[in-house]
Amino acid sequence: MSSKLRVGVAGPVGSGKTALVETLCLSMNKNYEIAVVTNDIYTKEDANFLINKKVLEEGRIIGVETGGCPHTAIREDCSLNKNAVLDLENKYNPLDFVFVESGGDNLASSFSPELVDLSIYVIDVSAGDKIPRKGGPGITRSDLLLINKIDLADKVGADLNIMKSDTEFMRKGKPWFFTNLSSGMGVEEIIQFLESHIPNNRN
């Protein structure tokens, strides 16, 4: 028996991927059975962070040391992550959600459909308002795009109106949200998006 929904979380270093996973676990774990797989190149830093924050019981969080390029471990050769997901699904059957957090990567990052059912891509305004129009699979093809840290827009000179216009053009109708995960802005909308994708049955 597999989990109902495997959700990939990708994005550049520092965009807010771990903050998103932390927030979703804390917000959803009373109503859903959840587990997490994190990716780091040489450490298990993100997994340890989530464990120390007590977002879930420790056994539900697995850290994968990819030892190389982050996108290889979620796309070309996702065996390490797939095995971690299967371990969690076997141990905590049934699971509603398994979140797979990629290591920080560039705009070319994308998940193998063998690993996840849907993907969330996280960028943030501190990288500049030009990021959405640069495109890439995360911007254009992810199931949900988040533009995080909008509270920093004025401080870094990012124009949210430009980001909105460019994002709507690049996404072609696919969903996206402005978020400020540190304050909780956008979290309810993300949860509703995830809940809307839970299948009735998945073998």
From Swiss-Prot:
- Cite the entry's keywords alphabetically: Chaperone, Cytoplasm, GTP-binding, Nickel insertion, Nucleotide-binding
Entries under Pfam families matching the protein: cobW
Quote the cellular component terms of the Gene Ontology held in the record: cytoplasm
Q: Which GO terms describe its biological process?
A: urea catabolic process
By its UniProt entry, which InterPro entries does this protein fall under? Answer: CobW/HypB/UreG_nucleotide-bd, P-loop_NTPase, UreG
Positions bound to GTP: G11, P12, V13, G14, S15, G16, K17, T18
MF terms in GO:
GTP binding; GTPase activity; nickel cation binding
- Predominant location category: cytoplasm
Q: Does the keyword GTP-binding apply?
A: yes
Localization of this protein: Cytoplasm
The protein's role, per its UniProt record = Facilitates the functional incorporation of the urease nickel metallocenter. This process requires GTP hydrolysis, probably effectuated by UreG.
Assembly and partners are described as: Homodimer. UreD, UreF and UreG form a complex that acts as a GTP-hydrolysis-dependent molecular chaperone, activating the urease apoprotein by helping to assemble the nickel containing metallocenter of UreC. The UreE protein probably delivers the nickel.
Sequence similarity = Belongs to the SIMIBI class G3E GTPase family. UreG subfamily.
Spell out the protein name for this chain: Urease accessory protein UreG
Q: Which organism is it from?
A: Prochlorococcus marinus (strain AS9601)
Q: What lineage, starting at the top, does this entry show?
A: Bacteria, Bacillati, Cyanobacteriota, Cyanophyceae, Synechococcales
Q: Which gene encodes it?
A: ureG
